């Protein structure tokens, strides 16, 4: 029997790779991809057969609910990512209400699988411990005030877990995603090309290749326990070392200056001044960012059989020099 998949966020950075991975994984399947507007994709997905592009809004279930009839698996990747305080209401509507609407429609349509692309932001970092799936935010109100995006993701996770006995629910929590099309590496590369000196925070961060995340989605269709969350990450590395790796890949030279505590306070003061002037750049306080964030992928390796296929250097190289 031919399987049918319903995918949201298919035009995004990760979403395009998910659509491609599902298309290659199940050559006979029908893919229904919900988008807000039609546009060309860097992976040229519009040229693929067996894909139905549907226009709709997750905040308006009447625009997509009928398309869930006959769907076996829902892959929910769409989300509004922002750290601007002024976007808090929009984030809640898009990420919490939108996910709730999709979940209710999927239950009503009798869908069997619901794969939710959450985020490592839905965890709580507790250095020097390595972050794992058990580390939920201990103060949800503080999370809501300081990180509405992460709050929206963990709130949706909780609602999904409540129905995990009625429908199979798998939650994936990717770390910082790299690979062809990555804006994170692109920003670093642009700074390297322009600046001879690079101020850099000193914390440990966690990275994974976009193609490895897409493969985790494919595995989650049949592997894993309903209601469980799985961190998807490949490499833990200090940001100074990460930047040195980007320099090496680009064959560039620049002086990296680790930011001191005083430097972090100075930058946060400038950010706060911009917010007061209503010029919010959408950057979180550096003091909130500048904490070690090593993450464990032991659970997804053990239960889904997932292993990263791309090293950090391979991910950076394909981000800086994507294939044409």
Set out the residue ranges of the language-model regions.
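N-terminal Rossmann NAD(P)H-binding glycine-rich loop of SDR-like oxidoreductase domains
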Residues: 3-25
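Glycine-rich Rossmann NAD(P)(H)-binding loop
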Residues: 8, 179, 199-203, 230-237, ...
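NAD(P)H-binding glycine-rich loop region in Rossmannoid oxidoreductase-like domains
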Residues: 51-97, 105-108
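Conserved Rossmann-fold NAD(P)-dependent oxidoreductase catalytic core, especially the SDR/UDP-sugar
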Residues: 97-148, 170
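Flexible, glycine-rich beta-alpha linker
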Residues: 123-124, 167-188
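Active-site Tyr-X1-5-Lys
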Residues: 144-170
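Substrate-positioning beta->alpha
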Residues: 185-187, 199-222, 228
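Mid/C-terminal beta-alpha module of Rossmann-like enzyme folds, strongest
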Residues: 216-281, 297, 313, 317-320
């Amino acid at each position: 029997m031919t399987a049918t998949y319903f995918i949201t966020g298919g035009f995004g950075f990760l979403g395009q790779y998910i659509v491609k991975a599902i298309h290659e994984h199940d050559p006979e399947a029908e893919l229904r991809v919900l988008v807000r507007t039609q546009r060309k994709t860097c992976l040229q997905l519009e040229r693929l057969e067996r894909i139905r592009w549907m226009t709709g809004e997750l905040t308006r279930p009447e625009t997509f609910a009928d398309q869930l009839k006959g769907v076996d698996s829902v892959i929910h990747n769409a989300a509004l990512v922002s750290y601007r305080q002024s976007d808090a209401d929009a984030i809640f509507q898009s990420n919490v209400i939108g996910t709730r609407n999709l979940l209710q429609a999927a239950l009503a349509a009798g869908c069997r699988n619901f794969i939710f692309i959450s985020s490592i932001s839905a965890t709580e970092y507790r250095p020097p411990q390595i972050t794992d799936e058990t580390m939920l935010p201990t103060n949800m109100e503080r999370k809501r005030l300081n990180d509405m995006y992460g709050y929206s993701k963990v709130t949706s996770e909780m609602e999904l877990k409540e129905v995990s006995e009625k429908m199979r629910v798998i939650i994936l929590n990717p770390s910082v995603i790299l690979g062809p099309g990555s804006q994170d590496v692109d920003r670093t590369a642009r700074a390297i090309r322009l600046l001879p000196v690079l101020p850099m925070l000193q914390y440990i961060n966690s990275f994974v290749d976009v193609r490895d995340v897409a493969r985790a989605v494919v595995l989650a269709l049949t592997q894993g326990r309903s209601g469980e969350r799985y961190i998807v990450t490949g490499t833990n590395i200090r940001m100074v070392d990460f930047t040195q790796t980007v320099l090496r890949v680009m064959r560039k030279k620049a002086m990296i200056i680790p930011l001191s505590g005083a430097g972090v306070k100075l930058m946060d003061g400038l950010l706060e001044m911009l917010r007061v002037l209503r010029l919010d750049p959408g950057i979180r306080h550096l003091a909130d960012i500048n904490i070690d964030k090593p993450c464990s992928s032991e659970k997804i390796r053990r239960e889904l059989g997932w292993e990263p296929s791309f090293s950090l250097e391979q991910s950076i190289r394909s981000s800086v020099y994507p294939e044409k």
